[in-house]
């Protein structure tokens, strides 16, 4: 029994897709356990970029099983489109498995998402308007439609009529918006269900059988710990649990079967949307990092907010997600800076604190306390070992590991697979 969970330790966009793709080489099953098509990940293979939103990164290994678990909310339209995109690029998808217990995102979820966000005005959360939150709301309210329901014509029709009637009352009475028509949704989405039917199964059985057989299973999280609905910067969070604990709920695999948790982070910090960001940069350094790091959302295309590396955030993520190994990405983006900074603590009303407050009001008053390190001017994109890095870059990597309190297993100096350097195999000693 061998399993590794990959989680983002910041606000998403840390490079999880790349690391998952990298670790997939030694895995036999790769599974997603939460989120939806609001999460975008980019994988570079032979200098070609592939952008995925729902399908696990392991799909590019045709001999491995890729799983969309029960904790994922699935937009069938987006999924069919993504499958067509992969087929058009010559990628086979016969190795995909989709949980019959996963909940379905329908047009009324997306419409409600937009209406709710518009109604918030200046207090908007910054949702991607993909219907994720409303779909999870229906799931919690026990009125959601699952993949198993989508495949049954009579059941889907019955539940869609009930849900649509309720949502239309909401649209008309609360939001003064036009209702949606049953006939505009039913046939289209039932057909999507038929197109993905071949992939649908009880994925909990597949995952547990694989683990019991001693196979290597890799769990791929979406978003990041700081967007976790319980442990993140609430309410500026997603509607699911990206933390490693989300695996047990979102995949149907018990906690006793999780061996290691790899936390993925960038050598700086970024975030899309609104919410607290203590180390955010508003100067030329921030603009430089954004442009060199190509910090624009995979899903939204929006410019990401960027800032210095925050070890307070990272220690919080380590604690609540049980991180055992760290993967540090995008060190090359910091090349050329005379000085690089790491936030080591916060100043809250004149008091030094080393924890991440739950209160948004306190977070607004938190000022980062920085440790400054000398930068490096060398191009490090061809470095293939820690010793190959310039001394200042090497010291930066080591200091990150010390402040977070987790050993660094891999570090990356560029987006390519070959630019990921192994310091310690996460698959060993399990």
Curated annotation (Swiss-Prot):
Binds 1 Mg(2+) ion per subunit. PROSITE patterns: ADENYLOSUCCIN_SYN_1, ADENYLOSUCCIN_SYN_2. Pathway: Purine metabolism; AMP biosynthesis via de novo pathway; AMP from IMP: step 1/2. It is found in: Cytoplasm. The keyword Nucleotide-binding applies. Substrate binds at residues 298-304. It is an enzyme of class 6 (ligase). The active site is at 13 (proton acceptor), 41 (proton donor). It catalyses: IMP + L-aspartate + GTP = N(6)-(1,2-dicarboxyethyl)-AMP + GDP + phosphate + 2 H(+). Plays an important role in the de novo pathway of purine nucleotide biosynthesis. Catalyzes the first committed step in the biosynthesis of AMP from IMP. This is Adenylosuccinate synthetase. It comes from Streptococcus agalactiae serotype Ia (strain ATCC 27591 / A909 / CDC SS700).
């Amino acid at each position: 029994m061998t399993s590794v969970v990959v989680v983002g330790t910041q606000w998403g966009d840390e490079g999880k897709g790349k690391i998952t793709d990298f670790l997939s080489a030694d895995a036999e099953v790769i599974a997603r356990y939460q989120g939806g098509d609001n999460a975008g990940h980019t994988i570079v293979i032979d200098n070609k970029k592939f952008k995925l939103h729902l399908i696990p990164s392991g799909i590019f290994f045709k001999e491995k099983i890729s799983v969309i678990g029960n904790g994922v909310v699935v937009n069938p339209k987006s999924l069919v489109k993504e499958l067509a995109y992969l087929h058009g690029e010559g990628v086979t998808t016969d190795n995909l498995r989709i949980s019959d217990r996963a909940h379905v995102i329908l047009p009324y979820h997306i419409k409600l998402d937009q209406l709710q966000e518009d109604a918030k005005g200046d207090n908007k959360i910054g949702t991607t308007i993909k219907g994720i939150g409303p779909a999870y709301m229906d799931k919690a309210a026990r009125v959601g439609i699952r993949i198993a329901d989508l495949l049954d014509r009579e059941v889907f029709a019955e539940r869609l009529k009930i849900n649509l009637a309720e949502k239309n009352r909401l649209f008309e009475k609360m939001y003064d918006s036009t209702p949606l028509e049953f006939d505009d949704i039913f046939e289209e989405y039932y057909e999507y269900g038929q197109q993905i039917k071949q992939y649908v199964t009880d994925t909990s059985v597949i995952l547990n059988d694989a683990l019991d057989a001693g196979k290597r299973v890799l769990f791929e999280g979406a978003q990041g710990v700081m967007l976790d609905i319980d442990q993140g910067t609430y309410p500026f969070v997603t509607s699911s649990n990206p933390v490693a604990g989300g695996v047990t709920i979102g995949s149907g695999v018990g906690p006793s079967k999780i061996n290691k948790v790899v936390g993925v982070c960038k050598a700086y910090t970024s975030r899309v949307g609104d919410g607290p960001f203590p180390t955010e940069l508003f100067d030329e350094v921030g603009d430089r990092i954004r442009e060199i790091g190509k910090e624009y959302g995979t899903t939204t295309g929006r410019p990401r907010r960027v800032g210095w590396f925050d070890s307070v955030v990272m220690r919080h993520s380590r604690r609540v997600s049980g991180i055992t190994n760290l993967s540090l990405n995008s060190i090359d983006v910091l090349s050329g800076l005379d000085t690089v900074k790491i936030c080591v603590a916060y100043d809250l009303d004149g008091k030094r604190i080393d924890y991440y407050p739950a209160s948004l009001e306190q977070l607004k008053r938190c000022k980062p306390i920085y440790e400054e390190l000398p930068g490096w001017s060398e191009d490090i994109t061809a470095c293939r070992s820690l010793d190959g890095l310039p001394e200042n870059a090497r010291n930066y990597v080591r200091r990150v590991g010390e402040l977070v309190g987790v050993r660094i297993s891999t570090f990356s100096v560029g987006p390519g697979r070959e630019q990921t350097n192994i310091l310690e195999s996460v698959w060993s000693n399990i």
